[in-house]
Amino acid sequence: MTTEIKKLDPDTAIDIAYDIFLEMAGENLDPAYILLFNLQFEERGGVEFVETADDWEEEIGVLIDPEEYAEVWVGLVNKQDEMDDVFAKFLISHREEDREFHVIWKK
């Protein structure tokens, strides 16, 4: 018997990712990136819910089912409203009782 996973709605996934970003950015991003993000966030900042990529295994070393995770990017958008400077990519489990997450930080 398989259990149906209640997926995170985009707004909830975005809130979770942004909270984690604010909490962990200081430990994981270069100070220059933090300064750039803070200076430009009001004008160009974005947090986007995107289609879950299927290449996370290459990044985190664990095979995942894209249907069981939400992917959210935090970064800066350009004039075409496209995120062209990604500071963190989040992979967040849809399972509320086991809300694991993975983050790829800008290097």
From Swiss-Prot:
InterPro entries, per database record: dsDNA_mimic_put, Put_dsDNA_mimic_sf
Matching SUPFAM superfamilies: Putative dsDNA mimic (SSF102816)
Signal peptide: none
Transmembrane segment boundaries: none
Job of this protein: May act as a double-stranded DNA (dsDNA) mimic. Probably regulates the activity of a dsDNA-binding protein.
Classification via HAMAP family: Put_dsDNA_mimic (MF_00680)
Family: Belongs to the putative dsDNA mimic protein family.
Stated name of the protein: Putative double-stranded DNA mimic protein NTHI1680
